[in-house]
A protein has these predicted regions:
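Transmembrane helix irregularities
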Residues: 29, 138-141, 250
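Membrane-water interface segments at transmembrane-helix boundaries in multipass membrane proteins
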Residues: 133-197
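Alpha-helical transmembrane segments of integral membrane proteins
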Residues: 2, 90-128, 172-313
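An internal, D/E-rich "acidic patch" concept
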Residues: 57-113
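Hydrophobic alpha-helical transmembrane segments of membrane transport/permease proteins
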Residues: 15-65, 158-179
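Hydrophobic alpha-helical segments of integral membrane proteins
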Residues: 8, 46, 50, 60-76, ...
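Hydrophobic residues within alpha-helical transmembrane segments
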Residues: 5, 9, 13, 17, ...
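Cytoplasmic-entry segments and transmembrane alpha-helices of multi-pass inner-membrane transporters
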Residues: 1-10, 114-150, 238
Length: 313
């Protein structure tokens, strides 16, 4: 249990440090939160009373402690611009972004694993060479540009979806999921291309090791050796990459949400930044950081399960 306890402690400490850095960064940004909430026409007495109420006169560490306790309890603060609870503002946005990134991840895995194995099994063949060329092109295209191309081709030319025709999950779940397919593809494509290349390289490297020759000597064919012996070892670095990609998709979805007019965390984050609505920005950044750190934590645990050289003791 030492390995699990160590990773869990690391997760908590990392989350604590990241939260403090985010809180401290917004604390030192020029501007008065009380003035932002009451406006420049507020009297000095009202401003002073609000500062006292918000605890702005307390030391930074004391303020962070109060904020962290409230955050854990679900109180993310109050929006400067809209004078409403941040929690209620982002509550409906979180499922949108999480669904988008989950679909992107599933598409990435569904494409990269079979294609990577096929290319490794037929290395040097015509299909393998074509996939390698296509991979290089896809990896060179930023996700937002992929989103624009997908919108032009599948939305405006082929009319497979209506650009900007987002359907809320509260209105129609099938319509909601259907609209997210193409944005998910835009996010997944570059990551899938990288995973294909990594898995192909990893499999080919494993195929050169002694235990593979031993497996062949026992009468196994290439397909049997690949799936029964090589894949378990070759996929370990790919799992690490997939975990990192899953975490990166949460941040990468911000731009894609703008391209496809999806009202997720990305839109409200950019709007809040332009409005200097720091409590909203702060809550979203900490939430994204939590998803990234928690994903890496799960990947570490899965890595231990896949690699027998790492023990829980």
């Amino acid at each position: 249990m030492k390995y699990l306890a160590k990773k869990l402690a690391g997760f908590v400490m990392t989350m604590l440090v990241v939260s403090f850095l985010v809180f401290a960064a917004f604390a030192v940004i020029p501007g008065d939160p009380a003035t932002a909430m009451l406006g420049t026409q507020a009297t000095p007495e009202k401003l002073a009373a609000l500062r006292e109420q918000m605890g702005l006169n307390e030391p930074l560490l004391v303020r962070f402690g109060s904020w962290a306790v409230n955050f854990i309890q679900g109180d993310f603060g109050t929006s400067y611009k809209y004078q409403m609870a941040v929690r209620s503002m982002i509550a409906e946005k979180i499922p949108v972004t999480l669904t988008l990134t989950a679909m992107s991840f599933l598409i990435m895995v569904a494409v990269s694993i079979p294609v990577g194995l096929f290319c490794a099994h037929h290395a040097g063949g015509k299909v393998d060479r074509i996939v390698l060329i296509v991979n290089q092109v896809i990896m060179a295209i930023p996700p937002f540009f992929s989103g624009i191309l997908i919108t032009l081709l599948f939305g405006l030319v082929l009319h497979l979806f209506t650009p900007g025709g987002y359907v809320s999950y509260t209105t129609s779940v099938t319509g909601f999921l259907g609209y997210l397919i193409f944005p998910s593809v835009a996010i997944a494509l570059p990551k899938a291309a990288m995973a294909i290349k990594l898995l192909r390289t990893s499999v080919l490297s494993e195929m050169k090791l002694d235990y593979v020759r031993t497996a062949y000597s026992r009468g196994n064919n290439t397909k049997g050796v690949l799936y029964q012996h090589v894949l378990r070892n070759a996929i370990i670095p790919v799992i690490t990459f997939l975990g990192m990609a899953r975490a990166d998709m949460v941040a990468g979805s911000i731009v894609i949400e703008q391209v496809f007019n999806i009202p997720g965390l990305g839109r409200i984050l950019l709007t809040s930044i332009s409005n200097r609505d720091y409590p909203v920005v702060q809550a979203i950044i900490v939430f994204i950081a939590f998803i990234v750190i928690f994903t890496n934590f799960l990947v570490d645990l899965l890595y231990q399960k896949m690699d027998p050289r790492i023990t829980l003791d």
